[in-house]
């Protein structure tokens, strides 16, 4: 019998087990975010001890550009099956253009580009034209959602350009997730349990090259420390998901917001300021902890 998508991915599905809460850290974070004018969800996990912080971590939030991590997962799934290769070439067409300031949009119709460069544009600069093209190359959002479901993720979904998900798109736009599920996806990559070790290593290398590091929480991590991250933002949303490879206590940190009162795009934006504050707190807690 030919193995199904579900039977293959079930081998790597997220583990379900009781997690201990770091009550001291949870209290510190709750104090840090007190008074925030919007809705917030936070998931933190010490990957050495397994202790967690869950603050509305099972609430669904818009992904904004963090949807590009599930899209990457769909692409790497095909690489794992041998249907795509890191050096596979694709031909750009003007019909692929998504209006904006994307680098790929400057290409001329007929120019060729390697899959690895499309992935770099999606994950490093968050190029939307590249991302929507990669969503198609991965088999479309519905196929990505089937993969996510088989991995055990029930709330993480691609909504844009997916028949039957129009109502979800109206609420959450391109994609949706919870802080906990996104943190678990990052953890599976970090622990090399999503695909082969080589492919998970490749995913981490791609996630380690985030261009957006000035306003965001990642700015509070010393540049000598590897951080695997993706951020996303639209008017009322500021999100970040990351694993900080602290020497003795590597940790997951996911912070999602929605319905934010402050929709400014300055460094002082309330959500960005809060994310930096929590990130600094976490680095002080984990980064120097024996």
Please name every model-derived segment.
Residues 19-59, 281:
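Beta-lactamase-like hydrolase cores
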Residues 50, 62-90, 253:
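Active-site SXXK
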Residues 1-23:
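Bacterial Sec-dependent N-terminal signal peptides
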Residues 20-32, 136-137, 141, 184-215, ...:
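Structured C-terminal helix/loop/strand segments within mature extracytoplasmic catalytic/sensor domains
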Residues 77-95, 141, 196-200:
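Short, well-structured active-site flanking segments
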Residues 97-133, 141:
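Conserved catalytic neighborhood of penicillin-recognizing serine enzymes
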Residues 41-45, 54, 70, 91, ...:
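Soluble periplasmic/extracytoplasmic beta-strand elements of cell-envelope proteins
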């Amino acid at each position: 019998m030919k193995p199904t998508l579900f039977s293959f991915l079930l081998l790597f599905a997220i583990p379900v087990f009781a997690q201990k809460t770091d009550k001291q850290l949870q209290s510190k974070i709750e104090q840090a975010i007190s008074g925030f004018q919007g809705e917030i969800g936070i998931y933190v996990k010490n990957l050495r001890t397994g202790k967690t912080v869950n603050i509305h971590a099972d609430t669904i939030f818009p992904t904004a550009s963090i949807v590009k991590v599930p899209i990457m997962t769909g692409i790497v799934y095909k690489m794992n099956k041998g249907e795509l290769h890191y050096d596979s070439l694709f031909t750009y067409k003007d019909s692929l253009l998504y209006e904006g300031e994307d680098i790929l949009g400057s290409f001329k119709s007929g120019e060729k580009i390697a899959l690895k460069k499309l992935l770099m544009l999606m994950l490093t600069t968050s190029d939307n034209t590249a991302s929507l093209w990669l969503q198609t190359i991965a088999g479309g959002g519905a196929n990505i959602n089937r993969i996510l479901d088989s991995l055990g993720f029930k709330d993480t979904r691609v909504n844009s350009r997916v028949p039957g998900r129009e109502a979800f798109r109206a609420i959450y736009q391109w994609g949706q997730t919870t802080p906990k599920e996104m943190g678990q996806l990052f953890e599976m990559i970090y622990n090399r349990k999503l695909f082969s070790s080589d492919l998970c290593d490749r995913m981490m290398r791609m996630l380690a090259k985030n261009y957006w590091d000035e306003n965001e929480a990642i700015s509070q991590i010393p540049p000598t420390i590897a951080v695997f991250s993706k951020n996303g933002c639209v008017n009322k949303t500021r999100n970040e998901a990351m694993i900080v490879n602290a020497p003795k206590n590597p940790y997951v940190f996911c912070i999602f917001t929605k319905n934010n009162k402050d929709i400014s795009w300055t460094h002082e934006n309330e959500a960005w300021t809060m994310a930096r504050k929590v990130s600094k707190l976490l680095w002080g807690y984990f980064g120097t902890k024996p």
